[in-house]
From Swiss-Prot:
The keyword NADP does not apply. Keywords: Antibiotic, Antimicrobial, Cleavage on pair of basic residues, Disulfide bond, Hormone, Secreted, Signal. Residues 23-59 form a propeptide. This is Hepcidin-1. It comes from Salmo salar (Atlantic salmon). One of its GO terms (molecular function) is hormone activity. It comes from the Eukaryota.
C-alpha cells in the first residue's frame, strides 16, 4: 500500500513538472542575438538575425466542408472533395 501511494505521488509530481515546463501557444519564444564581434554561425544570417519559421499549429480537420463545388465521385458521394481538380 505504501509503494502504491509513493507511485501515485511520483506520477502527480511528474505531471506538475511537465505542465510547468510547457510553453503555451500564445507565448512567443525569443532567441538570443549574438554580439557584433561573434562569428556568424551556420544557422544565422549575416545581419545577426536568425531565420526562424513559425512552428506549425495543429488544428482540426473540417471534414464536413467541401473543397469544390463539383464532385468527381472519387470520394463515393461523401462530398469531401479532396481529390477534385480545381
Amino acid at each position: 500500500m505504501k509503494a502504491f501511494s509513493v507511485a501515485v505521488v511520483l506520477v502527480i509530481a511528474c505531471m506538475f513538472i511537465l505542465e510547468s515546463t510547457a510553453v503555451p501557444f500564445s507565448e512567443v519564444r525569443t532567441e538570443e542575438v549574438g554580439s557584433f564581434d561573434s562569428p556568424v554561425g551556420e544557422h544565422q544570417q549575416p545581419g545577426g538575425e536568425s531565420m526562424h519559421l513559425p512552428e506549425p499549429f495543429r488544428f482540426k480537420r473540417q471534414i464536413h466542408l467541401s473543397l469544390c463545388g463539383l464532385c468527381c465521385n472519387c470520394c463515393h458521394n461523401i462530398g469531401c472533395g479532396f481529390c477534385c481538380k480545381f
